[in-house]
């Protein structure tokens, strides 16, 4: 009988290989699955880094000249600090006498705001206020309606009126956050009317109720500022309802306490008080929303994201910004002259692009994303009151950060993907994904790009909008990544050599003594060596390298795995981990879709005497195999 495991590996590998050989009649070079060095602190005075930063400086200046940009801000972060920054030009790009730019000048970050909106969504999900990102938004905000011709087609003729069947209520949170909702691109108002009485929520919803979705949900990516404005509104509504419910519960509790003292006289009064309190809460909230229809959203972002990250120079309201600190954007008129663009608040569109910030504040935001959601001590030092933030060390779970950085849809070019809401680009030269977000609004062009495996981040801002899919971050990454990888690999090699030298110098008797002190019962690698079979013909071979004493295994094929201890404390001597010996030799498939990093469980005989312990079998990939 053929070896089942071996056959499965071989057939799948050949099939994947065949698929990868030709694409669009062009032969592809099959590269190994990329691995990345672990980020550690680097001396920023390294000559290679200084040279890289000089090249980046030159690249930015050349690109500025090519695109008529006179004012530009650039920052690069690594691990938990800004490692390079430079500003070009003046606060007022049309006035050479205005102050020079700094990384503390306010700019409108435009659609980078969407990353904050998305983070709020994940926080509410983690805190249980949203049950699932795949919940329909109608469960939380039934007020929103839009027509869906695809729903009518799928349901047949529908109702007699033909109207009720086309009202779409199936859009989800995840679809809004990943531009998969099928909604139109823009809020149905002239952008100049954002934040005015000519673009209120009632006006927007009345207009949308007469419009249609453009596409089926999840059919393709269609960028939607409307979708994110709606998402922010719904999230704010969830917070508002949660706050009102908490206030009502508190009022009810107080009234119940009063009832205990005045059972007969106060029953009616308590009921009236409950109603009055509920109404007062609603009136107060409505008053705030009437002056700013995204108040609950903006207030939440301020207290639960900006303040905990010590982003104290970021705001949705430009009236909060010192006019002498605002970097001005400019545009080219039809006659070829330049003009400063007037600033404005974004009103209902605020969650899609209304935040003003600084390069220093956005650097703190990048550091947060690059460090698994852990708030840097540098970010937190001036923050004594995190208000409603429930966890001062993490705004979200580490697993949520990983989830938020994952793609939702891969574009057909194979190099571009969209997440919630990161715009991702695969750098073929360096075999690594850039997780980016671009912003364009009111003469500001911004770009944030993260390289999570290397803990590198870039934030660039231009005070002039020009036609480009990327604001220099891809070109800069071509300079940064090779240098950082080289230095990190070099440091890793030096560390491993030092550790090996220390191990060789360590006295063997001290090791044995330490093992005795810890009362550790070690098993010799020799007892695991052998061939393991089962009745179905599956094979698992364990062998040893005599020169190193290390254990290896295979499944009767060419994939060789290193066997290592599962637990360094040796509390589980029967459990081992298997890892591909040299993952750089393989494409990604066997690394992510095979036995790599699996745990295997050996069984021993019942004799507890050390001298007579023998291995009788192993459980691997769900199968039980017995030693022959």
From Swiss-Prot:
Location relative to the cell: Secreted
InterPro entries reported for this sequence: Beta-lactam-related, Beta-lactam/transpept-like, Beta-lactamase-like_AB/R
Residues making up the signal peptide according to the UniProt record: 1-28
Glycosylated residues (UniProt): 45, 68, 198, 241, 313, 335
Compositionally biased intervals (Low complexity): 245-281, 507-516
Keyword Transferase: no
Bias type Acidic residues, positions: 496-506
Keyword Glycoprotein annotated: yes
GO terms under cellular component: extracellular region
Region entry Disordered, spans: 245-285, 494-516
Keywords, comma-separated and alphabetical: Glycoprotein, Secreted, Signal
Source superkingdom: Eukaryota
Alphabetized PANTHER family for the sequence: BETA-LACTAMASE-LIKE 1-RELATED, PENICILLIN-BINDING PROTEIN
Family in the record: Belongs to the beta-lactamase family.
Protein name: Beta-lactamase-like protein 1
High-level lineage: Eukaryota, Amoebozoa, Evosea, Eumycetozoa, Dictyostelia
């Amino acid at each position: 009988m053929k070896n089942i495991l071996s056959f499965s590996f071989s057939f799948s590998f050949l099939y994947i290989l065949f698929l990868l050989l030709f694409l669009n009649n062009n032969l592809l070079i099959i590269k190994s699955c990329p691995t990345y060095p672990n980020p550690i602190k680097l001396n920023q005075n390294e000559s290679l880094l200084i040279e890289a930063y000089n090249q980046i400086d030159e690249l930015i200046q050349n690109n500025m000249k090519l695109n008529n940009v006179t004012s530009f801000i650039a920052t690069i972060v690594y691990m938990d600090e800004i490692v390079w920054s430079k500003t070009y030009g003046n606060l007022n790009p049309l006035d050479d006498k205005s102050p020079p730019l700094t990384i503390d000048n306010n700019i409108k970050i435009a659609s980078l705001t969407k990353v904050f909106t998305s983070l709020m969504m994940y926080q509410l999900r983690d805190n249980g206020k949203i049950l699932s990102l795949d919940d329909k938004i109608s469960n939380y905000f039934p007020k929103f309606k839009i027509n869906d011709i695809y729903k009518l087609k799928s349901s047949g003729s529908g109702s007699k009126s033909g109207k009720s069947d086309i009202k779409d209520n199936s859009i989800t949170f995840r679809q809004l956050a990943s531009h998969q909702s099928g909604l139109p691109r823009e809020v149905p108002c002239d952008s100049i009317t954002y934040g005015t009485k000519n673009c209120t929520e009632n006006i927007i919803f009345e207009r949308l109720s007469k419009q249609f979705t453009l596409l089926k949900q999840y059919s393709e990516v269609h960028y939607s500022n409307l979708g994110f404005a709606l998402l922010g509104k719904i999230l704010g509504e969830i917070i508002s309802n949660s706050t009102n419910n908490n206030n009502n519960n508190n009022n009810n509790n107080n009234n119940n306490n009063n009832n205990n003292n005045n059972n007969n006289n106060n029953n009616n009064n308590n009921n009236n008080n409950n109603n009055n309190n509920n109404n007062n809460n609603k009136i107060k909230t409505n008053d705030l929303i009437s002056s700013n229809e995204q108040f609950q959203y903006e207030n939440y972002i301020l207290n639960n994201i900006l303040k905990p990250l010590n982003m104290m120079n970021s705001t949705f309201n430009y009236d909060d910004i010192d006019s002498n600190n605002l970097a001005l954007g400019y545009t080219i008129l039809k006659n070829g002259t330049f003009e400063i663009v007037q600033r404005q608040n974004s009103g209902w569109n605020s969650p899609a692009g209304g935040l003003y910030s600084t390069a220093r504040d956005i650097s703190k935001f990048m550091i947060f994303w690059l460090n698994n959601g852990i708030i840097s001590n540098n970010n937190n030092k001036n923050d004594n009151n995190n208000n409603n933030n429930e966890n001062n060390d993490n705004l979200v779970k580490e697993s949520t950060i990983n989830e938020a950085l994952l793609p939702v849809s891969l574009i057909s070019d194979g190099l571009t993907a969209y997440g919630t809401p990161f715009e991702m680009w695969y750098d073929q030269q360096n075999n690594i994904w850039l997780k980016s977000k671009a912003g364009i609004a009111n003469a500001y062009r911004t770009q944030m790009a993260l390289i999570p495996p290397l803990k590198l981040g870039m934030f660039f801002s231009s005070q002039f909008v020009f036609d480009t899919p990327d604001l220099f971050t891809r070109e800069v990454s071509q300079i940064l990544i090779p240098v950082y990888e080289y230095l990190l690999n070099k440091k890793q090699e030096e560390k491993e050599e030092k550790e090996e030298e220390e191990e060789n110098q360590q006295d063997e008797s001290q090791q044995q003594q330490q093992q005795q002190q810890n009362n550790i019962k070690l098993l010799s690698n020799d007892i695991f060596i052998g061939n393991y079979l089962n009745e179905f013909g599956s094979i698992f071979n364990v062998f040893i390298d005599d020169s190193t004493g290390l254990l290896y295994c295979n499944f009767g094929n060419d994939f060789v795995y290193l066997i290592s201890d599962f637990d360094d404390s040796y509390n589980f001597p029967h459990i081992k981990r298997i890892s591909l010996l040299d993952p750089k030799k393989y494409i990604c498939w066997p690394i992510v879709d095979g036995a790599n990093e699996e745990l295997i469980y050996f069984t021993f005989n019942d004799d507890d005497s050390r001298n007579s312990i023998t291995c009788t079998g192993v459980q691997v990939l769900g199968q039980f195999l017995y030693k022959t």
